[in-house]
Every structure is written in structure tokens, then in C-alpha cells.
A protein has these predicted regions:
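Gram-negative bacterial Sec-dependent N-terminal signal peptides
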Residues: 2-19
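Universal eukaryotic N-terminal targeting presequences
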Residues: 1-2, 214
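Formylglycine-dependent sulfatase
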Residues: 14-235
């Protein structure tokens, strides 16, 4: 199965009017950065790129931020994520394939190389507070809950909420982590897309004033399975 990843927008502005009211903008040399990634969505699905689906909020972000006209897509999700997070070709990042297994040969180690810094590590060294909410999918499945894992908080992110691989379900994804703590219980009305967004908003609200922020939001949607919130199904 071929996977498509779409970088929705890279917004180099204050995040929302609510955040702007409570957190002053950092200096112009260190702008806030919000990177939003959607899984299995073609770029032309968005109205700001000519799509037929009306996406006014995303269009606003695109208008106020930066729109990519070119991006290397490997045709598989994990290698594309590794390229995005490191700025290197996927084989240089040791992510030539998926995360299921370490093939013990160059370019196919199943997770981002320790020898390459991630975008979060680079920005944190420049004084940024770094946050991630959503799908990681660039560490070995066998490394979950082991000391040699390559989790977001081990690769430059100060705070993390989300699923380390695809997730499999919007109602009860697995494995979900808050930083390095695994979450196993979910409320009855849990919905993964909403949880990712709520977590990102929470990180922003807790963000200290005058500190530049890098926020990486990696949604699982609209990746299969097609599961809507229960209240939408019942409506």
C-alpha cells in the first residue's frame, strides 16, 4: 500500500489569537514554528491547493504562513517522516523502509540514525521549546519501552503526546504515550484526532512567555481506518 503524506502548513506566526493574547511573540530571528502533518492526504485535497473540499481554516493558515511548493515524498510514510525531521534523504537517516524490523544494513535500520540531529534537536539548541503531538512512526516497533528507543522526548522534544506508530484505531490507538509514560486507559468518548489537537493546544497554553516555540502536530487522519467520532455517527 502506498502512503501519502501532506505537509499542511508551516506557520511562522503567533499561533492563534488566544495564544497571542497570553504569550508575547518572540524576537523576529526566532519566530514561533508550527508544522502540521496529515497522513494519507494528497496536497490537492485542500482548497488552498485547488481541491474541491472547502477547508477555510487550513486555507487561513496557508495564507498567513508558508506553503511548500516542493517536498520529497518517498511513497511510504516512515521514510517521508524521517526525511522531514532530519532534512536528509531517508536512507541517510537509516529509514529506507518501515519501522517493523532492523535489517542490519546501511539505510535500513528501522529508526532515525543517532548520527543525524532532528529538527527538534537543532531548534532546542537554538533556545526553542519543542513540542510534539501525534503520530511518530520513526522508531523500531521492537524498541517500544526499551532503553534504546528513539522516542520524541529522546530526539529533541520537550513534551510529547501521541502514538509511536500508526495507532490502528481512532477510538483506542496503541501504544499512546505522554512523554515516556504509556497510556492504557481511555475515556468512553475518546477520539484520537481530537486528543492530538487538544494536547497541542494544552502545550501551547503552558508555553512560557518570550520563549520561541516549535510545535510539530502529526495527525493520523485521514489514514485508514475510516472511523468518525461516535457523536457524528449517531447524529
Amino acid at each position: 500500500m502506498t502512503y501519502k503524506l501532506t505537509v499542511t502548513t508551516l506557520a511562522l506566526t503567533a499561533i492563534t489569537s488566544t495564544v497571542a493574547a497570553t504569550h508575547a511573540k518572540p524576537d523576529t530571528e526566532h519566530p514561533h514554528i508550527v508544522l502540521i502533518l496529515c497522513d494519507d492526504m494528497g496536497f490537492s485535497d485542500l482548497s488552498c491547493y485547488g481541491g474541491e473540499i472547502h477547508t477555510p481554516n487550513i486555507d487561513y493558515l496557508a495564507e498567513q504562513g508558508i506553503r511548500f511548493s516542493q517536498f520529497k515524498n518517498t511513497g511510504r510514510s516512515c521514510p517521508s517522516r524521517a526525511a522531514l525531521l532530519t532534512g536528509h534523504y531517508q536512507h541517510e537517516a537509516e529509514m529506507g523502509w518501515m519501522t517493523a524490523v532492523d535489517e542490519h544494513r546501511p539505510g535500513y535500520r528501522g529508526q532515525i540514525s543517532d548520527h543525524l540531529p532532528t529538527l527538534a534537536e537543532v531548534l532546542r539548541d537554538q533556545g526553542y521549546a519543542t513540542y510534539m503531538s501525534g503520530k511518530w512512526h520513526v522508531t523500531l516497533d521492537a524498541a517500544f519501552e526499551t532503553p534504546n528507543g528513539s522516542y520524541p522526548v529522546q530526539r529533541g522534544f520537550d513534551k510529547y503526546y501521541g502514538c509511536l506508530h500508526g495507532g490502528g484505531s481512532y477510538y483506542k490507538p496503541d501504544p499512546v504515550y505522554h512523554n515516556l509514560q504509556r497510556i492504557t486507559e481511555f475515556p468512553d468518548d475518546y477520539y484520537y484526532t481530537t486528543a492530538i489537537t487538544d494536547s497541542a493546544v494544552s502545550f501551547i497554553k503552558q508555553h512560557p512567555t518570550q520563549t520561541p516555540m516549535f510545535m510539530y502536530i502529526a495527525h493520523y487522519a485521514p489514514h485508514l481506518p475510516l472511523q468518525a467520532p461516535q457523536d457524528k455517527i449517531d447524529a
